[in-house]
Design a protein with these regions (language model features):
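Iron-associated oxidoreductase/ferritin-like identity signal
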Residues: 1-132
Length: 132
């Protein structure tokens, strides 16, 4: 969520209005994913991570601060993050398939959206190439 949200706020450069709008949309979708996951964790009798410091420690996909606000850089950072998320959700789907149907369903739904995000970031990269 935060990587897309803050990226939308600081973006500068090529296709900025389009990148900003897409990042805002992705941020909303990522927050929705977090909501689904928190609900599932609670359904399983566990507690979601409460301390943001723990997010960093336990995250398999790392947050990269948008220290360079250039849209090309931001799109690349988000593409890397999407690919990591895709790999993680695929692993979760593989682990849960035929065993935990609800976690599989939620993970598969998130995976589908992450694949869409990846395509949208790749489309921006193709658009940026047009300006060379």
């Amino acid at each position: 969520y935060y990587q897309y949200w803050i990226g939308a706020k600081v973006a500068e450069g090529l296709e900025r209005p389009k990148v900003e709008a897409e990042f805002k949309e992705h941020a909303a979708e990522e927050l929705k994913h977090a909501d689904w996951l928190a609900d599932r964790i609670i359904q399983l009798g566990e507690t979601p991570i409460l301390d943001p410091d723990e997010w960093k420690k336990q995250a398999k996909c790392k947050y990269e601060a948008p220290s360079n606000p250039d849209t090309k850089v931001l799109v690349e950072q988000n593409l890397i993050a999407e690919r990591c998320a895709i790999a993680r959700y695929q692993q979760i789907c593989d682990l849960c398939q035929g065993k935990d149907y609800e976690t599989f369903r939620v993970s598969r739904k998130i995976l589908k959206e992450e694949l869409e995000h990846e395509q949208e970031m790749e489309d921006f990269q193709a658009d940026f190439g047009y300006y060379k």
